[in-house]
């Protein structure tokens, strides 16, 4: 290898690193109320143990940049904290559209397994999947047709609070954990649309490495 070739390779690597620092990848983080979305945002912003969140998120906050570093690699992302109550679901759609979200993290916990009558998360998931798969931004009136780049690159379904429920249920492989069972129809619908789904477990409050690795995996593998 000549000196010039080596120099070009080094410069290309440095430009790539600079691009990762300056270019913020738009992530959308959605899910039911009190599932841990705000906690995840705190963990992305300040690495370490996240204090208890006392106030619920109201509406949609301004998107902010977060930089993650893991295994010597670095990525900059941009996320917005949005409430999970039914009246804020429309804000999820606005967030996807206005920020041109490329990756989506849908957060769940084990409430649907702990209390089988609690279907809040399944309803959230159905709304989100239908919104993503619809060829229109305004699905009701069939207006504002989406373009190919309006669909997310991948959707992650993250089972949060793993530290609290990891020993409560029997499973052999985390990818086949029963916590994901209630969401498989939506995952299949997304796959049929050509949008891959990434199943992941995380403890957003206490394990920053799990959070950072999950984000990095979505960016690098999809």
Stretch-by-stretch model annotation:
Residues 1-32, 140-141:
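Short, flexible boundary segments at extreme N-termini or domain junctions of P-loop NTPases and their
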Residues 26-49:
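Glycine-rich phosphate-binding P-loop
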Residues 35-36, 85-87, 110-115, 162-166, ...:
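Short acidic, S/G/P-rich loop/turn micro-motifs used as interaction or catalytic elements
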Residues 45-78, 84-89:
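Switch I (effector-binding) loop of TRAFAC-class P-loop GTPase G-domains
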Residues 89-135:
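Inter-motif core of Ras-like GTPase G domains
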Residues 103-106, 136-161, 191-201:
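Conserved beta-strand/loop subsegment of P-loop NTPase cores
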Residues 118-143, 172-186:
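Well-ordered, non-membrane alpha-helical segments in soluble/globular domains
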Residues 164-222:
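Canonical P-loop GTPase G-domain recognition
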């Amino acid at each position: 290898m000549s000196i010039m070739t080596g120099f070009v390779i080094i410069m290309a690597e440095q430009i790539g690193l600079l691009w990762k620092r300056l270019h913020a990848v738009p992530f959308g983080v959605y899910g039911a109320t009190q599932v841990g979305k705000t906690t995840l945002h705190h963990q992305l912003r300040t690495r370490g143990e996240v204090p208890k969140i006392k106030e619920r998120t109201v509406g949609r906050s301004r998107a902010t940049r977060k930089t993650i570093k893991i295994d010597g690699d670095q990525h900059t992302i941009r996320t917005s904290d949005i409430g999970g109550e039914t009246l804020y679901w429309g804000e999820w759609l606005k967030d996807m559209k206005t920020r041109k979200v490329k990756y989506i993290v849908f957060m769940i916990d084990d409430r649907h397994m702990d209390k089988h009558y609690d279907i809040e998360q399944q309803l959230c998931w159905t709304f989100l999947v239908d919104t993503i798969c619809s060829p229109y931004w305004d699905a009701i009136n069939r207006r504002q047709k989406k373009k190919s780049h309006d669909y997310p690159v991948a959707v992650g379904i993250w089972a949060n609070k793993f530290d609290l429920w990891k020993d409560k249920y029997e499973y052999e492989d985390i990818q086949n954990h029963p916590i994901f069972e209630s969401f498989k129809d939506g995952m299949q619908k997304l796959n049929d649309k050509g949008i891959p789904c990434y199943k992941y477990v995380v403890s957003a409050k206490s394990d920053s490495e799990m959070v950072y690795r999950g984000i990095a995996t979505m960016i690098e593998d999809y």
